[in-house]
Amino acid sequence: MGQPAAAQGSMVVAVDTHIVMIPSPGGPIPTPLPSPYSGQITGGTVATVKVMGKPAAVVGSVDQNAPPHIPVGGPFQTPPQNQATVRTGSATVLIGGQQAARNLDTATTCDDVAPTAPKGQIVAAGTVLIG
């Protein structure tokens, strides 16, 4: 059985790790801290194919983290980009020449420790199912 198809507005969720510079008497200490990521797919969709009335999401679709990551205890070592990109999709269904994105497919986020690891996961719901 297939998974619900992702579309513009579907969510990507993850827990990123960002390096925060924690103040100390000996100078700032780079400290990896978890940061929740939650954003809606907003770009890189296929406007000519609709899923529940919205443009279909595919591998390469992007989203923005909202609200953006907030450093706790000090400034970020490198400010996060607060963006994710869908990296996996259906092996059998193409939309606009790209793999269709579905619920539970993965995305890379702005994680500092493993920026190319697919830590994010799509959360999509609806009646259109894709295998």
Task: Locate predicted features.
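Intrinsically disordered, low-complexity proline/glycine-rich segments
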Residues: 1-131
